[in-house]
Amino acid sequence: MLLKNASFYDDEVLKRADIRLKDSLITEIEENLSPINNEEVIECEKLFVLPSFIDLSVTCLEGYENLKQKAFKGGVGLLNVFNGDQSDIKNIMAIKNNQLADIATLKHKGGEILIAPSDAFLELISHYAKSYNLPLLISLENSFEALNSGALAYELGQNFVDNAFENTRLVRFMEVSRALQIPMLLDKVSSATTLKLIKAFNDLGAKLQAQTPLSHLVLDESVYEDYEPRFKIAPPLRDKEGQNALKEALKNNEIAMLTSLHAFKNSNAQLFEESAFGCESIEDAFSVAYTFLVQKKVISFQQLIKVMATNQARFLKLNAGEVKENQLANLMIVDLNAQTRVSNQNSPFYGLELYGEVQRMILKGQTTFIKENACKKS
């Protein structure tokens, strides 16, 4: 496959060239490449090529193939799915049914990432991660309270997460990272206090990174005043001050990765109190991130690529996440000028007008998604 006249970033440098894909890899990046042996040619003039996103915090409740198609539409090529047998990234859930999993056997069967859902068996899990050099994702089970503690929770009479206790378990992991020099990714970080603790422990020698839900950078808890079930997300959204603190942390590279936190809302309940938690957002991931983070100048386009593709690939030790020769050809082609509106009524972003739209998804050199009438063959 040959991508003609592609605009892309090589590190921080904006370039325009032709990109050849062959045998799952990006094999050539040069100007004026010619097709070889009936090679498929995709005209990318006025379009942008970037690495496909990697989402490390996805819950599948709607069927894996349906989830994958939604992900492709949102520019997400690889998924780490928590609760199913199918996942692009082979994960090892360290604890199942309150018992320690057979981590050694699962590693030998191809496990690529170790997930700790609680701080039980912390010592054993940490030593397995260190011994097998496994990326360790700390994704603690949610308390499933509707709001964070504060004036709005009291005003609305909703159950809330007590902020005084939200970091007590995480601190144990932070200290283990420092003491044993184990790299850890802390999932669903939505508190400025958590980010300050991460920085403090890293200053002491820990190897911690933070991953934050995209929704928490776009929305704040004021949406709860409408009592709409689509906003019932775990962990809960923050107040405006907390949201602004997250944006500032992202701008200052204190947040390493973003996640759609996608979870199908497996409920038709009309009342906020009775509805299921969830965040149906992955199908609009690129457009939401581009509109609210890049267009609104929270971060640069280059930084968006890093926090949604490059840093994830490095954490997983994958040969992907950048547009470079000899990297895996996991790419998306986008139209940055296209305008769309979120149509999924269960999405927290429903009704929002967005900029940027995925035209084509390519995984290992093969097209997996194409928007109708997009990316014409030349």
Protein language model regions, located:
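Divalent metal-coordination and catalytic microenvironments
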Residues: 6, 24, 46, 57, ...
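Metal-cofactor-binding active-site regions of metalloenzymes
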Residues: 55-61, 74-104
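Short, surface-exposed connector motifs at secondary-structure boundaries
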Residues: 75-79, 90-91, 109-110, 176-184, ...
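His/Asp/Glu-enriched, well-ordered alpha-helical/loop segment
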Residues: 158, 164-171, 176-181, 253, ...
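C-terminal cap of metal-dependent C-N hydrolases
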Residues: 274, 328-375
